């Protein structure tokens, strides 16, 4: 699980510019497949071989006064408690404001490292504007420029050294790890409580791997499932959409750890942009996904609405066209047992492994049926393919011009794999390399490393 770093600062200090600067250090975030909603609330960053998730709080505070409201501070406290480091950004041009002083005092109780960034300092000559900030006696103070990159490398060197080492997820005895995610008040807590209250279930709480989190093991029909970080979900609370954005940190951490994301959407309200954004989080992290259309007992004209709802999901979340959907009612228990039948089916595909010979036969038939296109006057030649991971199934194909493979032909090859293997309910990762040879797992991008288990060539 990657460390999480949170950016704080008053409006217009350049948080978003700095955010974009840092996240561009790893430009190809995941797949180039069209249709993935990219909410710039978070991004993945790599520096000197260290990966971490960066969360931008820019959309949380509309003005300085928001910060001082008790319920806002409570939510910021929660975000900081979940973070492994905090960046407080100042405006080097306008100097210290009352907001900055209050924010510094607020962060004195933070248990994680705090880095103070004086932004808009783009040259050594402009560092004179940082004098009043250095006069505050702050440790970890850095003059930087999000727009031009000045000072960013020095700051990043110290930041990654302060982050906790990423520890591998402990073995879960072959339990399927589940994360229940969704927008506010969609029924996450109700579903968790319904699952844990079902008959014939054996329930126990076990320590999670994140601070103050609790994972819950439940056994259904002899199979064990791990519900990730149920502590927050089982405490029912109604908060505004604005405040709920802080929970994105917890959502990201849960998605980093899970095999399958159970994405709840509201049958009454329909598919919203926020639903698609959360689905995008899960897709980018390579999770198996199941849409749970909740509150179906309250929906009017159910049969007619079901087809419309599924069509909307397919239209707005094209990148998750493989994800099954089922209508449920967490409140009444309607079809809740059906969820676990789908989980088992998705997980079987999520951990699918294919022999190298069979995989290459699929590629041979696909490229023979639809000839590869040209790239700069030369036809693409697909030499060899190998599965390098499961969870999700991840493949690398060696081709003479990797950058010349258009997303449409890549999609065609993925569909060929789906068609011939029956993998219609799992994400599939396909990457291209120029030269065949030994797979260097250390050099893979984060999106390529999402697979839970490496596979040997057969």
From Swiss-Prot:
Native source species: Desulfosudis oleivorans (strain DSM 6200 / JCM 39069 / Hxd3)
Every copy of the EngA-type G domain together lies at 3-167, 176-351
What's in the keyword line of the UniProt record? GTP-binding, Nucleotide-binding, Repeat, Ribosome biogenesis
What the protein does comes down to:
GTPase that plays an essential role in the late steps of ribosome biogenesis.
Q: Enumerate the SUPFAM superfamilies for this protein.
A: P-loop containing nucleoside triphosphate hydrolases
Q: Which InterPro entries match?
A: G_ENGA (IPR031166), GTP-bd (IPR006073), GTPase_Der (IPR016484), KH_dom-like (IPR032859), KH_dom-like_a/b (IPR015946), P-loop_NTPase (IPR027417), Small_GTP-bd (IPR005225)
Listed name of the protein: GTPase Der
Is Nucleotide-binding among the key words of this record?
Answer: yes
Question: Record's Pfam families?
Answer: KH_dom-like (PF14714), MMR_HSR1 (PF01926)
GO terms, molecular function: GTP binding; ribosome binding
**A biological process from GO:** ribosome biogenesis
